[in-house]
Design a protein with these regions (language model features):
Chain A
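Transmembrane-helix boundary motif in ABC transporter permease subunits
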Residues: 88-120, 133, 286-292
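Transmembrane alpha-helices
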Residues: 190-228
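C-terminal transmembrane helix and the adjacent membrane-cytosol boundary/short C-terminal tail
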Residues: 169, 173, 211, 250-298
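Glycine/proline-centered hinge or cleavage motifs at structural transition points of membrane proteins
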Residues: 127, 186-187, 200
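Periplasmic/extracellular loop-to-transmembrane helix junction in inner-membrane transport proteins
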Residues: 9-32, 47-90, 109, 254-266
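Generic hydrophobic transmembrane alpha-helix motif, especially the helices
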Residues: 121-157
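Interhelical loop and adjacent transmembrane-helix boundary motif
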Residues: 68, 72, 224-276
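Membrane-embedded alpha-helices of multi-pass transport/permease systems
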Residues: 42, 94-101, 130-133, 151, ...
Length: 298, 322, 285
């Protein structure tokens, strides 16, 4: 670049024509690459949804899986997915939020707390298979309960805990100081301030976090294969926490790997479509209230 | 405490006094309310501290469990053999994990080589170039990509990507670190680009204005002002993406070939730490050296990802001091 | 932790109520009670689940929880007392290549599982001798032209160590010779499904799997001029098959015994078991 040698004239004043060319090239380039990637993503989503969605029936979604005949459903696996997601969220969201609130609001700035932060981030980066191994060590070897829903759900909760913590902390930190001070000035206690001012303001970030966590938990397979097994109890609406807890993502894996039903390919296509569709719904459903809220506050 | 007891005695006193009931009740409730609020505040804070400690506890118990089982490996296998030998054939009692350690690093590096430039371009596009409606559409779509189960990615890799690679390059198999890196790129792309996008978006408006005022084009502004200013945020995204690439299991295992040999070519079937663990963990006897060695590999993975976090922290501190 | 305890108690209470409602509607055909936990081989899982469904209809008070991780987890779980039945693809009361025997466990044959060597559709060779198979899987023969095919590299696809299919194939088809463990044209897969996809989509590939999984998109080769068919297994000419076993700690009793007896009954063996494309144990002389 010529500009580097002509120091006094500043770093940007080089050959104007060249710059314009570069700029156009750059814009073109960025648009091009982005368009390619976006097209690719859309093609990917289309590929998954188009293979499965058109042939979806209610019987498939609610039906019991079959081991030898065509037409088995995914009912119990789908139910387990939601059930385990719910349990893991029940554990991870309150704990994660409180830990996040602590880090954002109460924690003093010292070595111990920065160590705690490293722990949270460290836990967030732990590979999911490690949570699976940990789940085996904890539930299969220590408590000897075998492969169960509760084992899977707790392992999932551990997986989600740090993400929840971090997201809450960030969201609460992003709330303007004025808001907090105004609340204190009105005589509110710290808890009241957190409940009535901080959390409602930070809810958008927190909900995005829950959304992220729920999506991840819903699609997770390695942890669940190791801790909750690859089978269901074969009954619909089985709330027993000690039943084996195959989820839809695991069922997808199982059907591709071991099942000998003749329509395994179509089951896995449909399961994949259902999975992606549900995650899509999570994203939309969680966001709609936020959009409405945003509109209102405007 | 002293205050509370005095309040109590005061209340006791008023019980028998001649004062009107309304005052008595009123003051009582006031004080109750204060105590109650104090109590709620305290217990809430304690609950918060407990939750934060719980998160740390989980990490340490994971570290402890993995280490406790993993370290038993070294009863039967010398440490140097485990870390530096390339011979992994547990059925003949050789436990050299170097192939997997090397594979993990090679795969991660290759993934980053492909995904970082692409992600940054996408991030720049979303934050600086794209019109607002497109941005609002793109962000949820990228978030959605994070949620697609890795099994699905793996299956698409196995059925679409590998035959494609085989046809393009004319190799025999197509399995190997290149295939795995491409699949991983798709998986970490949303993570890196979303975080970089956020980092670029929060670069203060005035930086850009100043740059434009000096006569810079958009290209120059982005590359010389915006991206350097967002550097630490982008680094954070890259390292998170890296952590995901290192830890990904189900997608990698389907396309990497799972052969314990050194990944010295793009299309050579090889194996990484995660894929080897998941391939073998359910097929080894409990309490065997083999099982312990797999846990040791898990512990290694854990240490690698923790080191990376410490790296992020250092980077962030450097960013803050700047 | 306390939260999770209360939660689990609450959920269990709900589950109890739910099961008592559904339980009362089913006819009390049998007085058999208990809980059976099955763990182990994933290849036997479809069989176990199907049998469990039918058995539960006959004995509504028996709860069966079946799961699978890998063959070796079956007898291991039994030894640890986590499972009552360990499903395994080989007789775990004996030593097999790679695995020691489990003392004090009783093996019950439940099915005959035929295995087939399969190749991609583009492979022209359709008959392999035991010697040729041994050479291919041990890496001595690297090109299809040496075993009667076209001039192309052989891609060997193998199951991961510890797979029951691998143990059986090694014992019955390769007569105990070792597999290669590395090479440019060698890969390992995690499951029967992955094996299927790999052989279907990789030209010049050879692998092996339970006969059940063989599809029209691949080719099952003859071994020593004998086609891998059910009939050939039954008449004793095709040798590459193994029994599926249920391992129990000592002789079983109660519900576990009844369940194993149900699986071994001719009604199940000639009904669902056949439909699942396993071969009844009584068919083998």
């Amino acid at each position: 670049m010529k500009s580097a040698t002509t120091g006094t004239r500043g770093m940007f004043t080089s050959d104007r024509g060249m710059n314009n060319f570069n700029n156009r090239m750059f814009t073109f380039f960025v648009w091009g690459i982005s368009a390619c990637i976006i097209l690719f993503i859309c093609a990917l989503l289309y590929l998954i949804l188009q293979k499965g969605l058109p042939s979806l029936t209610w019987d498939f979604i609610m039906g019991l899986p079959s081991e030898m005949e065509e037409g088995g459903g995914i009912g119990p696996a789908l139910f387990n997915s939601f059930y385990m997601l719910l349990i893991s969220l029940l554990i991870a969201v309150p704990l994660g939020m409180m830990a996040g609130i602590y880090l954002a609001e109460f924690a003093p700035e010292n070595k111990v707390i920065s160590f705690v932060r490293i722990c949270v981030e460290g836990l967030a980066s732990v590979p999911s298979i490690i949570f699976g191994l940990f789940g085996i060590a904890l539930f299969v070897e220590m408590f000897q309960v075998g492969l169960t829903i509760i084992g899977g759900a707790v392992s999932l909760a551990f997986l989600n805990l740090p993400v929840m913590t971090r997201v809450t902390e960030e969201a609460i930190r992003a709330v303007p100081q004025d808001m907090k001070q105004a609340s204190f000035a009105l005589g509110a206690t710290h808890l009241q301030t957190i409940r009535r001012a901080l959390i409602p303001t930070a809810v958008s970030g927190i909900v995005t976090g829950i959304c992220l966590v729920a999506g991840r938990a819903f699609g997770e397979s390695a942890v669940i294969i190791l801790t909750a097994g690859v089978t269901t109890s074969g009954e619909m609406w089985d709330f027993n926490l000690l039943s084996p807890g195959e989820t839809l993502a695991v069922h997808l894996w199982y059907v591709q790997s071991e099942a000998i039903v003749p329509d395994a390919v179509s089951i896995s296509d449909k399961s994949a479509a259902v999975l992606v569709f549900i995650i899509l719904m999570f994203n939309i459903l969680f966001r709609i209230p936020l959009w409405i809220k945003e509109r209102k506050s405007r | 405490m002293q205050l509370e007891t005095s309040v109590q005695s005061l209340k006791m006193g008023t019980e028998e006094s001649e004062l009107g009931g309304s005052i008595k009740a009123g003051s009582g409730r006031m004080l109750d309310r204060k105590n109650r609020l104090l109590f709620y505040n305290r217990s809430f804070k304690i609950a918060c501290i407990a939750s934060a400690s719980f998160v740390c506890l989980v990490l340490f118990s994971i570290l402890f469990f993995m280490f406790r089982t993993g370290v038993l490996t070294f009863r039967d296998v010398p440490m140097a053999t485990f870390f530096f030998s390339t011979d992994w054939s547990p059925e003949n009692e050789s436990y050299g994990a170097f192939v997997f350690i090397f594979g993990t690093f090679a795969l991660t590096l290759l993934t980053l080589l492909i995904s970082v430039p692409l992600s940054i371009i996408i991030a720049v596009f979303m934050a600086e170039v794209a019109p607002k409606w497109m941005r609002n559409l793109l962000r949820p779509v990228l978030d959605l990509l994070v949620g697609i189960p890795s099994v699905v990615y793996g299956f698409l890799g196995l059925t679409i990507l590998i035959p494609l690679l085989r046809n393009i390059t004319g190799t025999n198999m197509g399995d190997g670190i290149l295939a795995a890196a491409i699949v991983l790129t798709i998986m970490v792309l949303p993570t890196i680009s979303r975080i970089s996008d956020d980092a670029i978006s929060v670069v203060p408006r005035k930086y850009r204005d100043a740059s434009y005022a000096l006569g810079a084009t958009r290209f120059q502004t982005i590359f010389k002002v915006t991206i350097p200013a967002a550097r630490s945020g982008i680094m954070y995204g890259v390292i998170l993406g890296m952590a995901r690439a290192i830890g990904e299991t189900m997608a990698v295992v389907m396309v990497i070939g799972n052969t314990p040999q050194l990944a010295d070519a793009l299309f050579k079937p090889t194996s990484v730490l995660t894929s080897n663990i998941v391939m073998q963990i359910s097929n080894v006897p409990f309490d065997s050296t083999w099982n312990n060695a797999l846990y040791m590999m898990g512990f290694l993975l854990l240490v690698i990802s923790l080191l990376m976090i410490v790296l992020v922290r250092l980077l962030q501190q450097k960013g803050a001091h700047r | 932790m306390k939260l999770f305890k209360t939660l689990s108690v609450a959920a269990m209470a709900i589950a109890l109520v739910a099961t008592s409602i559904t339980g009362s509607t089913a006819s009390a055909a049998s007085s058999l009670k208990g809980k059976i936990v099955v763990n182990g081989s994933s290849a036997l899982l479809p069989l176990t689940l199907q049998a469990a469904n039918e058995f539960k209809k006959l004995n509504p008070k028996v709860k069966i929880s079946a799961s699978a991780a890998g063959s070796i987890t079956g007898p291991q779980s039994v030894r640890k007392g986590i499972a009552d039945i360990g499903a395994v693809d080989w007789d775990a009361s004996q030593d097999v290549p790679g695995f020691k025997k489990f003392d004090g466990q009783v093996a019950h044959k439940v099915a005959v599982i035929p295995f087939a060597a399969v190749v991609n559709k583009n492979v022209t060779a359709d008959n392999l001798t035991t010697k040729q198979l041994q050479d291919i899987f041990s890496g001595k023969v690297k090109n299809w032209k040496d075993v009667g095919g076209e001039d192309a590299d052989i891609i060997v696809v193998n199951r991961a160590f510890g797979s029951g299919t691998r143990v059986n194939f090694q014992m019955k088809a390769l007569q105990g010779t070792d597999f290669i463990s590395k090479g440019d044209n060698y890969k390992e897969v995690k499951s029967s499904g992955d094996m299927k996809t790999a052989v279907e989509t990789t030209p010049n590939a050879i692998g092996y799997m339970d006969l059940v999984y063989v599809t029209s998109k691949m080719k099952a080769v003859k071994i020593n001029n004998i086609a891998p068919t059910e009939a050939n297994v039954i008449n004793g000419t095709y040798k590459v098959w193994g029994y599926g076993y249920y391992m129990t700690k000592g002789e079983p009793d109660g519900a576990v015994k009844a369940f194993i007896e149900y699986i071994q009954s001719s009604k199940f063996q000639n009904g669902s078991l056949k439909k699942l494309k396993f071969i009844p144990i009584s068919a083998i002389k």
